[in-house]
Regions:
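Alpha-helical solenoid repeat architecture
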Residues: 6, 16-33, 49, 58-73, ...
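Short alpha-helical interaction motifs and adjacent low-complexity tails used for partner binding
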Residues: 3-6, 21, 147-151, 185, ...
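Solenoid-like repeat scaffolds
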Residues: 10, 49-53, 92-96, 148-151, ...
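Buried hydrophobic core positions in alpha-solenoid tandem helical repeats
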Residues: 1-8, 43-49, 83-91, 131-147, ...
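Non-catalytic protein-protein interaction scaffold segments in large eukaryotic complex-forming proteins
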Residues: 131-265
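Alpha-helix N-cap/helix-start positions at coil->helix boundaries
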Residues: 15-16, 54-58, 97-102, 152-156, ...
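Amphipathic alpha-helical repeat scaffolds of TPR domains
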Residues: 58, 62, 102-120, 155-163, ...
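Short, hydrophobic/charged alpha-helical patches characteristic of ARM/HEAT alpha-solenoid repeats
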Residues: 1, 34-41, 73-82, 120-140, ...
Length: 633
């Protein structure tokens, strides 16, 4: 090391020697431990400093590529925040079809993507602005590179070009959303035969729309009722009649208010909180509109309540004193949810679920404030409970499908297809797709969050099918039309608010459908790039299998499929880079939650479970196959 240091210091102006030093460093940097030491000794900025000299550039780029290739967070952050501008200048100075161009892109992409996860985006945007990094110029150059025929060098360059374009899009969302050329590039990803490319294109479009629109907010009863009383246009009336007007959310809310008023009228006379609790405790399992803020007309020092909603904690205590523990906990949990105390509701429901594990409401209350993976697992457990009301089933399916969507996008845009997380991501995506299909079949068209889910189903459908979709998307028209109608109904409900807060999944759906047909031809060269990129080759490995929709769907029967009385005929799509048995290995045998950390049955070694509770709930069914006289520990 000291010899290289001396050689560099004594010959800074001799490009032939500095180039030789850079070449030696490039070989040494193959070792991660040595790379870390060389970085600490200050060699990274030295390599950047000689990029301006053409005779040194090849070796310097190779050394920098090795530096970032080890994915050390501090090295990637250093390159992104201090040296990105000079590396991007190389990208501008050389022809796009050269190896130097590919190396510059690789360095920027490998440095930027990890940095996006370690620095808050607004802070990184400020750093890029301060360093005068020309994001638009880089993106335009990338588009030029991706639109040309595939160059002869390594196909990994396409992967890095896509990653760099995505990373820069996060730093310039307004620019990307307003520039047709960039949007079409990301939409064209959805025509690729490579699942990872499709997932990356879908995720960046969806994330940009979430940033612009914000997360979806649920409808409230007042807005639904107001829109219902004003009346709907003919095509929306048809949508509602086809489902059943008396089964829709508006009717449910109005009927719930009427029923609650009748209960309150009786209990205002006798103040029998036990009877009040029995009535609304059952109603809370059936509808989201079981209790309203009606005035409590007999307020006193003993009953200091302004509304009947305020009386719910007291009602729960009265029920407990009469050994009605389940209804008491339902009422208190619902009160905590209505008042925004989600974690307290979760904790209460978690304790109650140990006493009565087959009440689906507990899992609904628990899953809302949880992180994605825990929420999905909990929702899937709830969907296995018997006798679920449509209200609870809808809530569980909403959480399960949206959380599975987020987890699928994360898993399918990160690891290699040989990684366990990749198989888990495919399972998440399949589960999301089936749950969305189910909820759109069973739920009213004006139900909570349904517009977001209808548009999300279109995104999941396109992500799954990709290049198999016909050029004019003919087979997709029924689900697209349903999403359009439900979205129009949602627009009528949220008439004023939507002017400033559109639905993210709707924005993404409109962007994708606007360009998906045309990019098949206009971006054919880019699509060919993606079909032969390194990710695609990994997915098409010698040991890779391509399960059909029917095979993958079998993995999720019981949780989502059984939530519907009918199981519609499924179309075919392909998952690349995994085997059916490999997906099954990461799925709970009871609740069907995808996970890479499961406990196996100690007897047969085939069944896998999230935890002991799932194992116990599955035992009655599993013991006939397992042949064990008692549950394994």
């Amino acid at each position: 090391m000291a010899g290289l240091q001396s050689l560099w210091t004594d010959n800074k102006s001799n490009n032939r020697i500095t180039s030789g030093v850079a070449g030696v460093l490039g070989d040494m940097l193959a070792d991660a431990g040595v790379a870390k030491k060389l970085y600490n000794d200050g060699w990274l900025p030295r390599m950047v400093s000689i990029l301006q000299y053409e005779e040194c550039r090849d070796c310097a780029l190779e050394a920098l590529s090795r530096f970032v290739g080890h994915n050390f967070p501090d090295i990637c952050k250093d390159v992104s925040t201090n040296h990105f501008q000079k590396i991007s200048q190389v990208f501008f100075d050389v022809d796009t079809d050269t190896e130097d161009s590919a190396q510059a892109v690789r360095i920027m992409a490998k440095a930027l993507m990890p940095t996006l996860g370690s620095i808050e985006t607004p802070k990184l945007i400020t750093i890029f602005d301060r360093n005068k990094i020309k994001i638009k110029k880089i993106l335009d150059r990338l588009m030029e590179k991706l639109e040309n025929p595939l160059p002869p060098h390594s196909p990994t360059s396409t992967c890095h070009e896509i990653d760099l374009a995505i990373g820069l899009a996060y730093l310039s969302p307004d620019l990307v959303l307003s520039t047709l050329r960039y949007l079409q590039c990301f939409v064209a990803c959805l025509r690729s035969s490579c699942m990872k490319v499709r997932a990356k294109g879908t995720r960046i479009i969806y994330d940009l729309c979430v940033g612009r629109a914000g997360r979806p907010k649920p409808n409230n009863m007042q807005q639904i009722a107001n829109a219902w009383m004003k009346g709907y246009p003919p095509e929306i009336d048809t949508l509602i009649r086809d489902y059943g007007e008396d089964r829709c959310h508006a009717s449910e809310g109005i009927n719930g208010l009427t029923a609650f008023q009748e209960v309150v009228a009786d209990r205002t006379i006798d103040l029998d909180f036990y009877k009040f609790g029995l009535a609304i405790g059952q109603a809370m399992l059936e509808t989201d509109y079981a209790v309203f803020k009606l005035p409590f007309e007999r307020r006193s020092s003993k009953y200091p309540f302004n509304t009947w909603l305020d009386a719910l904690p007291h009602t729960a205590n009265v029920l407990r004193s009469n050994a009605e523990f389940d209804k008491a906990d339902i009422i208190e949990a619902k009160y905590l949810m209505v008042t925004g105390k989600w974690m307290a509701a979760k904790d209460l429901a978690e304790k109650a679920s140990k006493r009565s594990p087959k009440i689906g409401f507990w899992y609904y209350a628990m899953c809302i404030p949880m992180e994605d993976a825990d929420s999905l697992r909990t929702a899937q457990k709830g969907l296995r409970c018997p006798g679920l009301s449509l209200y609870v089933r809808h809530g569980l399916l909403y959480q399960a499908s949206t959380r599975a969507w987020e987890l699928a996008l994360k898993a399918l845009t990160g690891p290699s297809p040989s990684d366990q997380l990749w198989s888990q991501g495919l399972a998440y995506l399949g589960l999301c797709y089936q749950n969305l299909k189910t909820i759109l079949t069973i739920s009213p068209p004006d139900s909570v969050g349904i517009a977001s889910l209808a548009n999300l189903f279109v995104l999941a459908h396109i992500l799954l099918h990709g290049p198999e979709l016909s050029p004019n998307l003919e087979e997709s028209k029924p689900i697209v039309e349903k999403a359009r109608l439900i979205t129009k109904l949602n627009d009528l409900i949220w008439a004023e608010e939507l002017a400033s807060a559109p639905i993210a999944s709707q924005m993404a759906r409109e962007i994708i459908l606007k360009h998906l047909v045309s990019v098949s031809e206009s971006r054919s060269a880019f699509i060919q790039h993606t079909d032969s990129c390194a990710w695609a080759e990994q997915e098409r490995g010698d040991d890779a299998k391509q399960p059909t929709t029917e095979e993958v769907s079998k993995l999720f029967e019981g949780a989502s499929i059984s939530s519907s009385s009918e199981d519609p005929k499924r179309s075919k799509y392909k998952f690349f880079g995994t085997e059916r048995q490999e997906i099954h290995l990461y799925q709970c045998s009871w609740c069907h939650n995808p996970s890479a950390v499961l406990r196996k049955c100690g007897v047969c070694g085939q069944a896998c479970y999230c935890d002991q509770q799932c194992q116990k709930l599955h035992w009655k069914e599993h013991k006939t196959v397992c042949k064990s006289p008692e549950i394994s520990k």
